[in-house]
From Swiss-Prot:
The chain crosses the membrane at residues 42-62, 73-93, 103-123, 128-148. This is CDP-archaeol synthase. It is an enzyme of class 2 (transferase). The keyword Hydrolase does not apply. It comes from Methanosphaerula palustris (strain ATCC BAA-1556 / DSM 19958 / E1-9c). GO terms for cellular component: plasma membrane. It is a multi-pass membrane protein. It catalyses: 2,3-bis-O-(geranylgeranyl)-sn-glycerol 1-phosphate + CTP + H(+) = CDP-2,3-bis-O-(geranylgeranyl)-sn-glycerol + diphosphate. Belongs to the CDP-archaeol synthase family. Catalyzes the formation of CDP-2,3-bis-(O-geranylgeranyl)-sn-glycerol (CDP-archaeol) from 2,3-bis-(O-geranylgeranyl)-sn-glycerol 1-phosphate (DGGGP) and CTP. This reaction is the third ether-bond-formation step in the biosynthesis of archaeal membrane lipids. Coiled coil: none annotated. The gene is carS.
Length: 166
């Protein structure tokens, strides 16, 4: 999951610039995604997740890491892209229900990256997903994700990358 965990904070850190939605609005008059989803953030977020995943692939044969899933370039790419795709889908829905950028949306804020990354992994590399997404692995993903999400958001808020601590 490391390639899925890094893209969101990296997108926040390195983002800015042109919004992905180009300022366009849905039929409800609200922005499609908002200013927080930018092309630079998307590209650099995905690249950061892929880079971390490639590092993981290069060291996965070390005896210390034999218990981790044996990632491939494809699984790493799908996890990184899926994490930000899940975040964008959540942002789209968030705008439709009237929540503004930065507004808290418990559970959706924590698990959007999990839903997006695992769904894309299931679609794009079912063999990898079928072997590696065991009940214990899914359990630990569900337990650790909100804890990591909270810690990263507090750090982002403390260093001024995020406007809100959630």
């Amino acid at each position: 999951m490391l390639p899925a965990y890094l893209p969101n904070p990296a997108a926040a850190l390195f983002g800015g610039g042109t919004p992905i939605d180009g300022g366009r609005r849905w039929s409800d008059g609200r922005r499609l995604l908002g200013d927080g989803k930018t092309w630079r953030g998307l590209v650099l977020g995905i690249l950061s997740g892929v880079l971390l995943g490639l590092i993981q692939v290069s060291v996965q044969d070390a005896c210390v890491f034999v218990w981790l899933p044996r990632h491939t370039v494809l699984s790493v790419l799908l996890l990184a892209v899926g994490a930000l795709a899940g975040d964008m889908v959540k942002s789209f829905v968030k705008r439709r229900i009237g929540k503004e950028r930065g507004a808290a949306w418990p559970l959706a804020d924590q698990y959007d990256l999990v839903a997006g990354s695992l769904l894309l992994l299931l679609i794009g590399d079912y063999g990898f997903a079928a072997v590696n997404l065991t009940i214990p692995v899914i359990f630990w993903i569900l337990v650790l994700t909100p804890l990591l999400h909270r810690a990263v958001n507090l750090i982002g808020y403390a260093i001024g990358v995020k406007d809100v601590p959630w």
